[in-house]
């Protein structure tokens, strides 16, 4: 909230016209007649009603005796009343009360406490806060002062006029405390502070220790101690090295003292030294841009395919695809018809191609470390079966080029593609129903080819039955048949992809059957 947003009401009083009731005037006249002893007569004020009966003399005598005992303890005589009659009761109260009007706020110093109680009570305050109905203690105090003045000098007056214009201190809550203070005397207790004098009557009085140590109202505030927040910040700065929030812990420095700079000033962040070549730099940016000669790029090369990795874990994951599988000796032995194909060896020797860095995740039927996938036409060895099939396809294309020109063959499928074959040669596959072209497309051969290629070892056969018989006898350990259809695969990942693609519902049912059934409640 901005400063000065709330408007405070001023405590200064403004002159207000008011009228004193007639009943109070009659009571004041009755009190003046026995107490003043005819010392001073005041013109009566006409009242609309009959006057009340005078109080009994016993009550007046008791009031005079109590007030005389209270004034006997006071250290000095009461102040002399102002001379002259005060007959004006209407209009501006300054005409009837010529004493200067004071502000209800108390000064900073305590000089006003040295005055007498009645002088302070009658001169301080504003007529606006005067009581229309004075309390009995105030009436007794006014009557006693008049009696004392009459007995002492003979020309005194009673306090009835002053009671009509009494300040706010003669209210119900403070009249008895003021009378008790006057009866106690100034030396029996500590004087009242300005804050205690301005405190409303309903609140409890402040303890003596608080009153004695209360600073002045407008005095400059003493400089307070350092804020605890700043102290907390300094405390946190000391604990930066062991901050549990960062998750780090800075270890202690070396035992020997660090070397100082040439200029003599200390570096706030320490020395910027390369930990490998021990070279020192002026700032952290120069150290970051420094390329140490000892830092070399470490390469992890696969011994099977010469593929390079930057992490040993990646190389270990890659080498799982290079598990050596023993190839039967019958597959390594050359076929008798290999001599008849010697002419095609020179023609198709340059057409073969091999990838330098093949992908490790696609094929799992890789050869051993020596590359035992050998072509029977040209005795060329390959690390992977897919490379051998691609090479054999080039041999077949070269053989067909000598005869009728065949149509362009489809691109060679990967090793995990489907290869459908059945248990016996008498059974007919669905692919053969539409002709030999589709089956040849699966094998990567043209429709006009009269030989059938073994997908594992690359051997060619003149008929489909001979190829299936060869696969059953020699490559039964490397065949992965499908559980839901007669298709057969030569790699476990190929079979897994086939099941996920072609048999997702059956695979899901198998997984659910493996989970134990919960008994019904």
UniProtKB/Swiss-Prot annotation:
A Pfam family per the record: zf-C2H2
One GO CC term on file: nucleus
Biased composition regions of type Pro residues, renumbered to the chain: 43-58, 76-85, 404-415
Compartments in which it is found: Nucleus
Record keywords: Cell cycle, Developmental protein, Differentiation, DNA-binding, Metal-binding, Neurogenesis, Nucleus, Repeat, Repressor, Transcription, Transcription regulation, Zinc, Zinc-finger
Phenotype seen when the gene is deleted: Mice die during the second half of gestation; lethality is caused by heart failure due to insufficient catecholamine synthesis. Display pancreatic, intestinal and sympatho-adrenal endocrine cell development impairment. Exhibits fewer terminally dividing neuronogenic basal progenitor cells (BPs) in the neocortex.
Main location: nucleus
Composition-biased stretches (Basic residues): 1-12
SNAG domain: region residues: 1-20
SMART domains documented for this protein: ZnF_C2H2
Residue ranges, compositional bias (Low complexity): 209-223
Zinc finger (C2H2-type): 272-292, 300-322, 373-395, 452-475, 480-503
Stretch list, region Necessary for interaction with CCND1: 43-56
Expressing tissues: Expressed in adrenal gland. Expressed in the dentate gyrus of the hippocampus and the wall of the lateral ventricle. Expressed in pancreatic and intestinal endocrine cells.
Gene Ontology molecular functions: chromatin DNA binding; cyclin binding; DNA-binding transcription factor activity; DNA-binding transcription repressor activity, RNA polymerase II-specific; histone deacetylase binding; RNA polymerase II cis-regulatory region sequence-specific DNA binding; zinc ion binding
UniProt xrefs under InterPro entries: INSM1/2 (IPR042972), Znf_C2H2_sf (IPR036236), Znf_C2H2_type (IPR013087)
A GO biological process held by the record: regulation of gene expression
Disordered: region residues: 1-59, 76-107, 180-230, 320-369, 398-419
Sequence segments annotated as region (Required and sufficient for interaction with KDM1A): 2-7
Family according to the record: Belongs to the INSM1 family.
Function: Sequence-specific DNA-binding transcriptional regulator that plays a key role in neurogenesis and neuroendocrine cell differentiation during embryonic and/or fetal development. Binds to the consensus sequence 5'-[TG][TC][TC][TT][GA]GGG[CG]A-3' in target promoters. Acts as a transcriptional repressor of NEUROD1 and INS expression via its interaction with cyclin CCND1 in a cell cycle-independent manner. Negatively regulates skeletal muscle-specific gene expression in endocrine cells of the pituitary by inhibiting the Notch signaling pathway.
Free-text comment on this protein's domains from its UniProt entry: The C-terminal region is necessary for NEUROD1 promoter DNA-binding and transcriptional repressor activity.
Protein name: Insulinoma-associated protein 1
Organism: Mus musculus
Gene responsible for this protein: Insm1
């Amino acid at each position: 909230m901005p400063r000065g947003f709330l408007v405070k009401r001023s405590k200064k009083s403004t002159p207000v016209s008011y009228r004193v009731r007639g009943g109070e005037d009659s009571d004041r006249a009755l009190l003046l007649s026995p107490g003043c002893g005819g010392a001073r007569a005041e013109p009566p004020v006409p009242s609309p009603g009959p006057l009340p009966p005078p109080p009994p003399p016993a009550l007046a005598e008791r009031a005079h005796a109590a007030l005389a005992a209270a004034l006997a303890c006071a250290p000095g005589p009461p102040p002399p009343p102002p001379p002259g009659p005060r007959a004006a009761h209407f209009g501006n109260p300054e005409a009837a009360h010529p004493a200067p009007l004071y502000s209800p706020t108390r000064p900073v110093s305590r000089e006003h406490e040295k005055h007498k109680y009645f002088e302070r009570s009658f001169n301080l305050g504003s007529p606006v806060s005067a009581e229309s109905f004075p309390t009995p203690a105030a009436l007794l105090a006014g009557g006693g002062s008049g009696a004392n003045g009459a007995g002492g000098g003979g020309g005194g007056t009673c306090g009835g006029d002053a009671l009509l214009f009494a300040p706010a201190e003669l209210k119900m809550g403070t009249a008895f405390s003021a009378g008790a203070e006057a009866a106690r005397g100034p030396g029996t207790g500590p004087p009242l502070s300005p804050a205690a004098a301005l405190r409303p009557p309903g609140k409890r009085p402040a303890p003596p220790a608080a009153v004695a140590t209360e600073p002045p109202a407008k005095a400059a505030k003493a400089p307070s101690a350092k804020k605890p927040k700043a102290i907390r910040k300094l405390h946190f700065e000391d604990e930066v090295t062991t901050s549990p929030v960062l998750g780090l812990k800075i270890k202690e420095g070396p035992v020997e003292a660090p070397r100082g700079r040439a200029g003599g000033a200390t570096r706030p962040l320490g020395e910027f030294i390369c930990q490998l070549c021990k070279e020192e730099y002026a700032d952290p940016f120069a150290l970051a841009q420094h390329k140490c000669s000892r830092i070399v790029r470490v390469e992890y090369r696969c011994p099977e395919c010469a593929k390079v990795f930057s992490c040993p874990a990646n190389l270990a994951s890659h080498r799982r695809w290079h598990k050596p599988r023993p190839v039967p000796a019958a597959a390594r032995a050359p076929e008798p018809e290999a001599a008849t194909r010697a002419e095609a060896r020179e023609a198709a020797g340059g057409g073969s191609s091999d990838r330098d860095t093949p992908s490790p995740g696609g094929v799992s039927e890789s050869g051993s470390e020596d590359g035992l996938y050998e072509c029977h036409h040209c005795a060329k060895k390959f690390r992977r079966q897919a490379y051998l099939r691609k090479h054999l396809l080039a041999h077949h294309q070269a053989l067909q080029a000598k005869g009728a020109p065949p149509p362009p063959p489809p691109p060679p499928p990967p090793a995990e593609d489907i290869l459908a074959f059945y248990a016996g040669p008498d059974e007919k596959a669905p692919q053969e129903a539409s002709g030999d072209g589709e089956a040849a497309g699966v094998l990567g051969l043209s429709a006009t080819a009269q030989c059938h290629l073994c997908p594992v070892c690359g051997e060619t056969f003149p008929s489909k039955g001979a190829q299936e018989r060869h696969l059953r006898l020699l490559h039964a350990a490397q065949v992965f048949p499908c559980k839901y259809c007669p298709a057969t695969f030569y790699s476990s990942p190929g079979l897994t992809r086939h099941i996920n693609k072609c048999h997702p519902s059956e695979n899901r049912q198998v997984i659910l059957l493996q989970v134990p059934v919960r008994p019904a409640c």
